[in-house]
């Protein structure tokens, strides 16, 4: 970079026709369009019009002449105002005038005789010369703008040098004030230039340089003041020199970006996706070969070499200190699986070459039908590399979860030692702080290595570079404070560097979060919290206060990070049911679970730290710890609610079948048993496969009914329509009850099933009340009777679910044997038939019949059958009851809408003023404001271009060259 006294050098060739700003492009585009249109006149051959009388050509020629005149007027004005490029601009204006006159003459001659190839060729050459002249004029005008910016930079450089040469604090304050004024002017001019730059990389460089200038300007004053106040402390000079260097580099960055010069090698090092991700992408592309041209001698060594380089990178990650033992074993296992899959694939290629099993048509596409052994081997190879990617991502997330936890603690400890004036401790803690910073940079680079997000990787690497350069200066500020602990200036300097460090760490953290998957983060965080919970319990039992306190702090930090990241993630979505459920889960963890956990930790530490052992309820602590784990897991379940099966396939911690059926009305979940024990749900999960298959058949029928309800409620906006809201609630509860029969879902015990049945009955009663109000207002007797009949069905099937749930409650696990209490079942069975008889008697014969009686009244429930058959009968009854109720709800929703339309049809607008429920069509399904992109899509995504084709002048000129033959 030039010094303060060096002349301004424009790194720009005036003869170059490269367009670097959007303004020049937009100004040139109309002229290019007009000239191109004129040149292409009658390009399709002779027309039916009279020769030599093309009115359109004359109009186009006149428009070109007018556009040229406008450029001349603006060019002359710019030339008068410019000081540095005055001669060049005047020369360019004269050239445009000369070429414009030539173009006017040749275009007029061509317009008179558009079929003449000679006149057309002459006009093409004139058009090319005119476009070149206008382009050069605009580029020179653009260079004049850059010169004005460089002049501002020169003034700022001189002001910076003046600040550096200040001799006392008063002089510094005066000079810094002048520097600040020039900074404001420079920022305004640079911002305008940034918006005009055509190259997005140059815009990014300009934005980064402006940000660095603003950031370091705040540190410039305190660092200079500390140096003037304490010149005998070497650390103050290091601080000041660092800040001055950063400001100078920022000024140079603005100058380079403004002129759109090539980036330096350092900046080029920041570009591109991660090395390991790129290697895996390349390997995945290389394994798909043409079997007819496959050569083992040619392809085997290169593929094996590429794979071994990938495995070497994976091994380095596996051997890192923060990688868990189980994760290391999984990475090693996946590496071995990938090796074996490659050998199997190469063998299949050899077999295809040897036996020639590929058909000609298949060879053209490069693939055979799905069942072909080679395709199977390719798919297996791809799956294994995908599995390896997943384990590497989880390993990286292990590092991130551990390293980006309580990132401010080493800094706070360092500052506290500096405030006490203990230079020895400061040096010791400085080493800890330096190791912490190095770890952040190392982990950030690891995250980059496996990421396909090119822009995100660039941001992370730049932020990591800033962290690396800022770390020594934070230590210098601490050393200054330690040497002069009573100095207000040293304290202010420390505060400024502290704030800057914290901001930079936040930038790095957010950048790392952007290139990692929130699903991976939640999965790893959940596992880490479970590890820490177990460590806490062990420390509590062993009376290890330090470990308990430290591990509990880690749990609080992990939970806080989960809450922060998920809240930020939800800002990418429009508000709706999905975001509401996720935010409710985070709110519960933040406001209820974590305060209770912190309270229990405090009680435990006080009890263990007391000289005389204090009584402490260990189970309360374990329950509070378990709730933290459950809270994080609930957040994860809520986040995964909208994931597709393909996205969930990469999450090995969740079984695919738990998410096969997802809709707007239900959320399916699973549960881990942290505490060993046989709940009713666990018993259901242990049924023989034959019994599970029968239950699955019933569940499939239930899902068909559920799909009908989904389709019906999806039509309507539930705001102002409690019937739709209740239908969704009932569907969700019924899904949980059917999940229970498969050993899944949130319902764990028979008491949970009974409570769920009660909730359904309550919702059914509320729906009955609303729908009867609709029926009362319906003037059509047939519609009214239909609706009432469907409501009677709901009452019947709600009662049926109550009975089936109570039957399950009578199944007791006594000494490992299940016993069915026949008396209780008989009483509920009798009560049910009394209700069913009343319902059928009160309904329309066309709507209800004895065939609808619930299956839970079958005699199998009274027998003393085996344990498995009893459980099967009970589960089947529960599912069928839910299916029948689901069907009744669907019919009720439809009938309620029909009845409402009849009412409005008869009473007109008066009905709209006081409707029981509001029937409005639902708006299109909400989508994320920011599209979630899979990591593998970053390289293959295609951005849609502008609808309007932009023809660059250079391209237009090259096209004209091809026309010279005319």
UniProtKB/Swiss-Prot annotation:
Which PANTHER family did the record assign? ALPHA CATENIN, CATENIN ALPHA-2
* UniProt organism field: Xenopus tropicalis (Western clawed frog)
What topology does the record note for this protein and the membrane?
Answer: Peripheral membrane protein
Q: Record's Gene Ontology CC terms?
A: actin cytoskeleton; adherens junction; axon; cytoplasm; nucleus; plasma membrane
Q: What is this protein called?
A: Catenin alpha-2
Q: Where is this region: Disordered?
A: 924-952
Key word Iron present: no
Q: Which Gene3D superfamilies match?
A: 6.10.250.2510, Alpha-catenin/vinculin-like
SUPFAM superfamilies recorded: alpha-catenin/vinculin-like
Q: Which GO terms describe its molecular function?
A: actin filament binding; cadherin binding; structural molecule activity
Any one GO biological process: axonogenesis
Regions of biased composition (Basic and acidic residues) lie at: 924-940
Q: Which UniProt keywords apply?
A: Cell adhesion, Cell junction, Cell membrane, Cell projection, Cytoplasm, Cytoskeleton, Developmental protein, Differentiation, Membrane, Nucleus
Point to the regions of Basic residues compositional bias.
941-951
> Keyword Nucleus on this protein?
yes
General function of this protein: May function as a linker between cadherin adhesion receptors and the cytoskeleton to regulate cell-cell adhesion and differentiation in the nervous system.
């Amino acid at each position: 970079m030039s010094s303060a006294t060096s002349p301004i050098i424009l790194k720009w060739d005036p003869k170059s026709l490269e367009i670097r700003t959007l303004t020049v492009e937009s100004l040139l585009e109309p002229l290019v369009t007009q000239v191109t249109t004129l040149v292409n006149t009658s390009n399709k051959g002779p027309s039916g019009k009279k020769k030599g009388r093309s009115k359109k050509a004359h109009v186009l020629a006149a428009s070109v002449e007018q556009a040229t005149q406008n450029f001349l007027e603006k060019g002359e004005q710019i030339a008068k105002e410019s000081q540095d490029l005055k001669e060049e601009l005047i020369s360019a204006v004269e050239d445009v005038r000369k070429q414009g006159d030539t173009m006017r003459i040749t275009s007029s001659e061509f317009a008179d005789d558009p079929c003449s190839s000679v006149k057309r060729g002459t006009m093409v050459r004139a058009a090319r010369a005119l476009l070149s002249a206008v382009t050069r004029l605009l580029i020179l005008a653009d260079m004049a703008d850059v010169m004005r910016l460089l002049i501002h930079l020169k003034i700022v450089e001189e002001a910076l040098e003046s600040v550096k040469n200040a001799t006392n604090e008063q002089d510094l304050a005066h000079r810094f004030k002048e520097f600040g004024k020039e900074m404001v002017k420079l920022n305004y001019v640079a911002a305008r230039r940034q918006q005009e730059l055509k190259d997005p990389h140059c815009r990014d460089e300009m934005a980064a340089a402006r940000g660095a200038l603003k950031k370091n300007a705040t540190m410039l004053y305190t660092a200079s003041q500390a140096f003037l106040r304490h010149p005998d402390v070497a650390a103050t000079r290091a601080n000041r020199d660092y800040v001055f260097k950063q400001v100078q580099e920022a000024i140079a960055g603005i100058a380079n970006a403004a002129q759109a010069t090539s980036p330096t090698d350092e900046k080029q090092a920041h570009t591109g996706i991660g090395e390991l991700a790129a290697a895996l992408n390349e390997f995945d592309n290389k394994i798909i070969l043409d079997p007819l041209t496959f050569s083992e001698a040619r392809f085997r060594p290169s593929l094996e070499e590429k794979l071994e380089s990938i495995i070497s990178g994976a091994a380095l990650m596996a051997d890192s200190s923060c990688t868990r033992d189980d994760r290391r074993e999984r990475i090693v296992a996946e590496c071995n699986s990938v090796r074996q899959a490659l050998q199997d694939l190469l063998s299949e290629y050899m077999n295809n070459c040897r036996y020639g099993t590929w058909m000609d048509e298949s060879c053209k596409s490069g693939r055979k039908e799905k069942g072909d052994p080679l395709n199977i081997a390719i798919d297996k190879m791809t799956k294994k590399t995908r599995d390896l990617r997943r384990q590497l991502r989880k390993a990286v997330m292990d590092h991130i979860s551990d390293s980006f936890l309580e990132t401010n603690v080493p800094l706070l400890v360092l500052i506290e030692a500096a405030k006490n004036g203990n230079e020895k401790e400061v040096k010791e803690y400085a080493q800890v702080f330096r190791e912490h910073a190095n770890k952040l940079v190392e982990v950030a680079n690891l995250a980059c290595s496996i990421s396909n997000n090119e822009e995100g990787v660039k941001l992370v690497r730049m932020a990591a570079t800033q962290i690396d350069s800022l770390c020594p200066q934070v230590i210098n500020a601490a050393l200054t404070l330690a040497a002069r602990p009573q100095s207000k200036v040293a304290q202010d300097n420390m505060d400024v560097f502290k704030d800057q460090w914290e901001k930079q760490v936040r930038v790095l953290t957010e950048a790392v979060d952007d290139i990692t998957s929130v699903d991976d983060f939640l999965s790893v965080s959940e596992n880490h919290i479970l590890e820490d919970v177990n460590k806490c319990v062990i420390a509590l039992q062993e009376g290890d206060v330090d470990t308990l306190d430290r591990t509990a702090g880690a749990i609080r930090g992990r939970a806080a990070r989960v809450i922060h990241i998920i809240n930020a993630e939800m800002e990418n979505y429009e508000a709706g049911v999905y975001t509401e459920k996720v935010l409710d889960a985070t709110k519960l963890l933040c406001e209820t679970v974590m305060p209770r956990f912190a309270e229990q930790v405090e009680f435990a530490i006080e009890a263990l730290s007391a000289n005389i052992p204090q009584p402490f309820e260990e189970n309360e602590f374990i329950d509070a710890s378990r709730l933290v784990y459950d809270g994080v897991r609930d957040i994860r379940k809520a986040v995964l609610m909208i994931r597709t099966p393909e996205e969930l396939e990469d999450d090995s911690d969740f079984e695919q079948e738990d998410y096969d059926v997802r809709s707007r009305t239900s959320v399916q979940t699973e549960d881990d048993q942290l505490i060993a024990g046989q709940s009713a749900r666990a018993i259901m999960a242990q049924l023989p496969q034959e019994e599970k298959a029968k239950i699955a058949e019933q569940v499939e029928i239930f899902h068909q009914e559920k799909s009908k309800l989904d389709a019906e409620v999806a039509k309507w906006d539930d705001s102002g329509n409690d019937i739709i809201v209740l239908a969704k609630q009932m569907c969700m509860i019924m899904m949980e009850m059917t999940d229970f029969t498969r050993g899944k879902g949130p319902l764990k015990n028979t008491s949970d099933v009974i409570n769920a049945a009660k909730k359904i009955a309550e919702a059914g009663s509320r729906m009955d009340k609303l729908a009867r109000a609709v029926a009362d207002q319906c003037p059509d007797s047939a519609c009214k009777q239909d609706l009432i009949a469907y409501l009677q069905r709901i009452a019947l099937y709600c009662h049926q679910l109550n009975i089936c749930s109570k039957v399950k409650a009578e199944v007791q696990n006594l000494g490992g044997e299940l016993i069915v209490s026949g008396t209780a079942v008989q009483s509920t069975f009798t009560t049910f038939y009394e209700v069913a008889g009343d319902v059928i008697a009160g309904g329309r014969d066309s709507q209800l019949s004895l065939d609808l009686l619930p299956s839970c009244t079958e005699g199998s429930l009274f027998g003393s059958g085996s344990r498995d058959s009893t459980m099967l009968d009970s589960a089947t009854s529960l599912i069928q009851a839910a299916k029948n109720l689901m069907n009744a709800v669907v019919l009720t929703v439809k009938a309620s809408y029909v009845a409402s339309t009849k009412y409005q049809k008869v009473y007109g607008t008066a009905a709209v003023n006081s409707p029981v429920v509001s029937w409005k069509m639902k708006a299109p399904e909400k989508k994320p404001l920011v599209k979630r992109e899979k990591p593998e899509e970053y390289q293959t995504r295609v951005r849609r271009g502008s609808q309007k084709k932009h023809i660059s002048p250079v391209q237009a000129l090259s096209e004209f060259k091809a026309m010279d033959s005319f």
